[in-house]
Structures are given as structure tokens and as C-alpha cells.
Amino acid sequence: MSGSDLRRGIATVLALSACHLSSAQTVEEVLVTARSLDDTLPAELARYGHQVDTISADRVAAAGYVDVSTALQYEIPGLFVSPGSGPYDYVDVSLQGSRTGDVLWLVDGVRINNRIFNDTSPDTLPANMIERIEVLKGAEGLFYGTQGVAGAINIVTRAFQDEPGGNVNVSLDSNEGYHLAGYGRGALGDHKFVAYASWDKGDGYRQFDLYQPSATDRDRSYEIMNVGLKYGHDFSDRTRLDVLWTHTEARLDNNSAARTRRSYNHRNEEIASAKLSVEVSDTFEMLFKGYLHDWDTSYANIQNRPGTMEEVVIYPPGSYWGFKDYGGSALARFAPEGKLEYHLGYDYQNYTARDEVFPIAGKTETVHAFFGQMRTAKDALERASLAGGLRYNRGSGGKEATVWNVSGRYDISDALYVQSVVGTAFLLPSAEQLYYTGIAGDEDYAGNPDLEPEQSRNVNLSIGGHLPLASNAFAWILTGFARDVDDLIDIGYDDPEYPNGRYENVAGTVKVRGAELAVSAPLGEAFRAHASYTYTRSRDAGSDEQRVRIPVSFAKAGFTYAPEHARFEAGASVYWVGDTYWSTSAFGRRNIGNYATLNLSGRTFLDQAQRHRIGVSIENVFDERYATRLSQVQADDGTGAVLVQRLGVPQTFSLHYAYDF
């Protein structure tokens, strides 16, 4: 069997089986175009004990999601996602008790994390570009590098296909939001093409629970345009080239509950990559990849002076912040006859960041990494698959990190299995932590170019299985996870040269412990239900309090009705969040959790061929009022700080139309 045939088989089976534990499980097919080692890495890791969940494009369309964040929020077990103020906003993410910056984001395997603050948000990734989303849980630093501490989220863009086809869709919602999108794909001989584009605009809703009179811009609006092109060429059955380019232009409000007249980010973002896959023989395959991620943002903050309402320019339009991240990698797979196969690779990253808004000196960081993994061959062991690997990283200034992991899966029977991943991961300091120079005139903390990477030890252990039930299977998985983080980077006050604090590697170990249970079951021929519950205990060294911005517990549940060959489908999803703490300097620690939201969706096909469809969705059906963030502003009358809540999405109605061709 050739390498490409093996990849296609593994990827298809594992992508479909991974769907059994999320609401993505109702999909009719998952398009997997296994054109390189990079494409099928998540699916292959699942075979060796890594937990991988998948959302398909069809599930995204059926539920009426317009951006990546909302789809992840409701669909993936164990992943807490909290958009600040609805679609296309910054998000808080916690995967198995992690911080936002502990999760690596990728587009077609290309890292898109914002290393300025180590907390990149997918706030400009529209749903139209999605073929599927793959979520890998647990330490994923071996192949993916820094920030894969708790896992990785890979957004796979529209796949190639030989037959011409595509989609056009439009929608509008009750927050004065409008969406227009489409894509097309096909092939001319050995040349394959995909093009996609989308435009989203919304006036938004009032994002805070109270405003000072000086805040005159009170609705968070957005406008986003995204275009993308993919090109693939088969030089032969064994040599393939894939090229991706995607461009995003966005204007996103960045308002406050006091003094705001105009405040926004105007962003231009480019993501480009090229991959060359070469099967030298049936046993040896190589992948060469280069990438560029260029992020340029023009920021403006114009305020009103309380009382007089005189215009005050804090940051004039054109104030710059952004970064450029480029690099390359090589990966080789050697699978000789026998019981073992080998993977070897090299990564190079060059990163430059500059911020005039949050003063960060323009510095360049380079990272070189060598990694390898040894795996048991597909049929080497009757019921088990095992893998182990090592990665060495060396960055600018001699900063080093070495990580490893060992993983495996054992099928106790056809209906019961156990799997585990044990290893280490690392997190490089952000540009802010290294090079922040402080705001002139303020008593401000400082960056520290001598910081060492954070180091973590991770264990994931799962037991799962399935039982035949009706025409499908009842599937379940119970996962326990543990993570210890050393050399945590935080602001310290021990150095007398920095009385206002300086970033340092603090003493002590942050401990994360938790468990996740997910089940999925058919309820007759047309109905399916799924549910998950996650509990996390995340503590700083010497503390008995839950770390802020990480929920103690949360749960998700969904129900779908999708009869085969019927013209009508419907779904419901529930999202419950337990105790979740935020802290402000004036008001201390507060609990903003303990809320639940319900979404409903439905769509009907207008023709026998199911090319035309109309859908409706209702987000937050009961108009639950809940906070996603806490902040404080100064009262206009000078009486001091005022606590304000940033509110989640209110009850929102959406209408959708789509045409497949």
C-alpha cells in the first residue's frame, strides 16, 4: 500500500470516528484530501492515543454559525470558549483547564498565534472558509512547537475536489448583522483550484451592562472581508504541490463603557503557505513547507472629555501594532518493512513584532527546532498502537527547551479501548513579556529579555467505547487530565531596579487537574443526542483558589433531527458554565459564571436535489443576561472606579439562504 493510500484510509476512518463524540457527528461525510503528511497528522495522532474532536462544514452550516469561535463554543467537548461580545470578537479559551495562550491555533497546519501577547483570537476567521475544524487535546508540542501546551486547533480550509462545485449563502440577524459568502472549486487536469470569499457586517449590540454619559459609541460594530485562493498541482502520482493564500481586512470596534467616541482596530492580515509533498518510494515520504503570517493593524482611540464632551485623541488613526511571522519546515516519514516507522523533522520560525499602542520595541526572534517520533507500524501489534518522540528547540539568545511525549491506544475489545498521552511541553515568552518598554509617564511594569520558556508536564488518560444501538452506536469517552507548569511567567516585584514590577519566571508550580466525560447516542433513525461535562481544578502554587478566567466546570449538550433523504432538519444546543472568576484592581475577585444558554436551529431544502435551502436560528432563546468579562472604568463625576460587565450575546434571530452548485 502506498503512503497516499494509507493516509487516505487512516484519515477517513479517524475523522469519521472522531465525530462520534461531538455534534459534528451528524455529518453525512467528511472530505479528507490527504495530499501530504501535514494534512493527516491530527488523524494519525488519534490512532496513537491522542484525543481529537472534529466539526464538519455541514454541521457549521446546519447550526447557522457565522464564525469559528461560535462553532467551537457549542460543539467541542472539554473546550471552553467565551467570545467577548458576540461574533468576530476576542475570545477567552480554556482547553482542559488551560489559559488562552496555552492553545495553538493553525490554519491548514500554519500557526497563526499572535506572539505579541500569546493569546491569538480567531476573531477574523469566517465560517465560510471551513472544511472542518480539528481540535487536538493535551500537550501537542512535539510536532507543533510553542503554545501547544494544552492542545491545538486546526482550521482546515475548503478542500480540493475534481468535480466542479461550490456554494453561495446569505444571512441576516436581529443585531443588524449581514453575511454574504461563497466558494467554488474544481480541477483542470492535474491542476486543482479553490476560491472562497465572504463579507460580514454588523452593528452589534450594547456590550456593557452600564455606561457613563461620556461613552457615545455604545454598540460594538464590525465589518470583515475575507478572500482566499488554493492551488494544487499533481506533478505525478507521487509529487504534489499545494499553495494557500488568504487575505482578511477588518474594522472591529474596541469600545469602553466610558469616554469612547471612536475606538477601533483596522486590520490587514495575510496568511500564505506552500507545501511540496514527495513520495520517494512506498516506504519513504517527505514534506517541505514554507509559510508567512503578516498582521498589520491601524488603531484609533478618540475619547470624549467628561462634562464638556470635548474630543480627546488618545491614539490617532494609524497608530500601528502588528507582527510578521515566517518560516519553514521539513518532515520525513520512513516506514520500512517491519514493526516500526519513523518521523523526523525540522522547524524554523522568524518572528518580528512592533506595537506603538502598547509600547513594545521592534525585535526579531528566531527559533530552530529538531524533532522525531518512532511509531509502531499499522499492523505491528494486534490491538495496540504506540508512539514516542522528542523535540529540541533553540531560540534567540540561546533560550532552549526540550520536550518529549509517549502515547498509545489499546483496544481491549471491539467495544472498549484505553488511550493515553504522557509528556512535556513548553511556552516561549511573548513579545510583550520580553520587550515591553512601558507607557511614558506611567508607573508601569517592564518586560524582561532574559526570561526562560515555561515548562509543563502533562498526562491525559482516557477510557472509551461504543455499544450498538439502533442503526448507529452509543459512544462514550471519559478522560482524566493533569498538567504541572514550572517557570511560570508573571510580573514580580523582587528586583529593586523595577519597583513597579517586571516579568520574571516565578517560583512554584501551577497544578491543573480535571476530568471530561462525553457521550453521543442515536435516538431512533432520525434523532441523535450528545452531551459533555468538564471539571477543572487549576491552582497557583500555594493557593486554594481557582485561577481566574478558567471555569471550574461547564457542560454542553445537543440534539439533532436529520432524517435520511428528508427535506427538513433541526437542532438544539445548550451551553452551561459554572463558577468562573474574574478580578479587577478596585473590586477584587468576582464570580461571573453560573449561566446557561439555549440555541435552536432548523433548515429546509426547497428542491428534490437539495440545492436550495432556507434556515433559521435563534441564539440565546431565553435572552439570558450573563457576563463574559469584568472591567472597571472611572466615573464621569470623579467619584472613582465603577465596575462594569461585558455582556454575552442577547437573544438573536437569524435567517439564512444557501444554494449549492
Region spans (language model):
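C-terminal beta-signal and adjacent terminal beta-strands/loops
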Residues: 34, 205, 426, 576-582, ...
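Periplasmic-side early beta-strands and strand-to-turn transitions of outer-membrane beta-barrels
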Residues: 154, 161-163, 171, 183-267, ...
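N-terminal periplasmic "start-of-domain" segments of outer-membrane beta-barrel proteins
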Residues: 29-63, 92, 100
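Membrane-embedded beta-barrel scaffold of Gram-negative outer-membrane proteins
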Residues: 283-301, 411, 418-419, 452-506, ...
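Short acidic/polar hinge/loop motifs at secondary-structure boundaries
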Residues: 92, 110-137, 448
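Gram-negative outer-membrane beta-barrel transporters
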Residues: 342-343, 377-383, 475, 481-484, ...
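Extracytoplasmic beta-strand/coil segments of soluble accessory domains associated
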Residues: 69-110, 131
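A beta-strand signature from Gram-negative outer-membrane beta-barrel systems
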Residues: 124-169
